[in-house]
Swiss-Prot record:
Highest taxon in the source lineage: Eukaryota
Entry annotated with the keyword Metal-binding: yes
Induction (UniProt): The expression of the dibenzodioxocinones biosynthesis cluster is positively regulated by the transcription factor dibT.
InterPro entries in alphabetical order: AflR, OAF3, Zn2-C6_fun-type_DNA-bd_sf, Zn2Cys6_DnaBD
Name of the molecule in the record: Transcriptional regulator GME11370
Membrane-crossing segments per the record: none
Region (Disordered): 49-83
GO biological process: aflatoxin biosynthetic process
Principal location listed in the UniProt entry: nucleus
Composition skew (Basic residues), residue ranges: 51-62
Organism: Pestalotiopsis microspora
Length: 409
């Protein structure tokens, strides 16, 4: 009579459902449906767990066979130096108990010319003896002869390694960032905008002074032209370059305001630009002296000086306004790119916030949750919009203040 077969053990199910394990999320382990699958109204399925460890499959490694027709021919191995008559077979035929004096004696058939082709045997920098003075050690001698028995470099060509660098990507460096940084250095506070006196005059607040506006205006024109050239380059879509360009434009507008009010932007003074402007205006107003301005070859002085000075600066602001159009387009493009990057980053963080690590997730084991590494984005989505708003607000304030100077003069 056959005994009944033992009951078959029920297979062990995984602790995490298939949906949570595939998404690498922590499962609530509720059966028949976990909280996540129940919330998403998805089928919750617990698969049979598998034993941890490596699975030995029936895969066999295939060793590629090389047919004799496709096998490369071996290079001929030559142990003879190019210009010498010494053969390694002669060395092997030498008795082991060869004496050192007999080895170097010229009576054994070797001449000075034969050994001159092997200078490594008589290297004076090596202080240790090559051979024992009583008997010749075969292995020490073979090691000492390894240098002159090397293959000539002409028999085996050196492989070309330059082909490995052909696939590397190369970046196009147009030098726009360097130009903008040079402009920023040129406009640094260490080079203040001074009220330059008329040639032959002293800049004295008590006896009168003169303003040389032409160099400031010409320099600002050159800077704005350089910025316009950089904006025409495709590299101007870079956020870091755009940020530096905006700083340069702000500096140029500050120089226009300083020229209109005869302010001095000195790095030694930590006060704001508005305080400097007010002090300079009050200084020239309190003196009550006549001031002259040089515009090209024209000299304007007397009561019309303040009006002319502010009017000239006001007429130059159209250059900044024309530059703002191209700069705004670049800022809009950079803002859209930053917004897309933020959306993509947020979606990745939403998926990876509860991610689990380790091989135990696929085996149904409890694995501690790992900390998601948040990537640092260089710019916020609203950063470039704020830059554009600040530039337009600064230009509007400069235009209004300069217009007010013209009216009051």
């Amino acid at each position: 009579m056959n005994s009944p077969s033992p009951p078959r053990a029920e297979p062990k199910l995984r602790d995490s459902c298939h949906a949570c394990a595939a998404s690498k999320l922590k499962c609530s382990k509720e059966k028949p449906s976990c909280a996540r699958c129940l919330k998403r109204n998805k089928p919750c399925q617990y698969l049979v767990t598998r034993r941890a460890g490596r699975h030995h499959g029936s895969r066999s490694k295939k060793v590629p066979t090389i047919s004799p027709a496709s096998a490369p021919e071996p290079q001929p191995f030559s142990t003879t130096p190019p210009d010498g008559d010494f053969m390694i077979e002669d060395y092997f035929a030498t008795p082991i108990s060869l004496q050192f004096p007999d080895f170097v004696d010229t009576s054994n058939g070797s001449t000075t010319q034969d050994w001159s082709t092997h200078p490594a045997l008589f290297d004076t920098t090596n202080t240790s003896p090559l051979f024992d003075t009583s008997t010749l050690n075969f292995f020490d001698a073979a090691e000492s002869l390894s240098a002159p028995l090397q293959l000539p470099t002409s028999t085996i060509p050196f492989p070309e390694i330059s082909h490995g660098l052909q696939g590397l990507p190369t970046e196009h460096h147009c030098g726009c960032l360097v130009q903008v940084l040079q402009l920023m250095k040129k406009l640094s506070p260490s080079t203040p905008v001074h009220c330059t006196a008329w040639p032959g005059q002293q800049l004295d607040k008590d006896s009168g002074s003169a303003l040389l506006l032409q160099p400031i205006i010409a320099e600002n024109q050159s800077i704005l032209e350089t910025v316009a050239t950089v904006l025409a380059c495709p590299c101007s879509e870079d956020g870091f370059l755009l940020s530096t360009i905006c700083l340069v434009v702000l500096k140029v507008m500050s120089r226009y305001e300083a020229a209109a009010r005869c302010a001095s932007l000195s790095a030694t003074n930590s006060r704001s630009e508005d305080a400097l402007v007010e002090d300079n205006v009050a200084q020239f107003t309190a003196t009550g002296s006549s001031v002259a301005v040089l515009i090209g070859s024209y000299k304007v002085e007397g009561e019309g000086f303040d009006r002319m000075r502010a009017h000239i600066v006001l007429s130059e602001l159209h250059r900044v306004q024309g530059l703002m159009k191209g700069l705004s387009e670049r800022l809009h493009v950079a803002g859209r790119n930053a917004k897309d990057d933020n959306i993509l980053h947020a979606s990745r963080m939403n998926v990876d916030s509860d991610a689990v690590t380790g091989a135990g997730a696929s085996a149904g084991e409890d694995v501690p949750m790992g900390d998601a590494t948040e990537a640092v984005l260089p710019f916020h989505a609203s950063f470039f919009g704020q830059l554009e708003a600040n530039l337009r607000r600064r230009l509007r304030r400069l235009s209004e203040s300069t217009t007010d100077l013209v009216r009051r003069a």
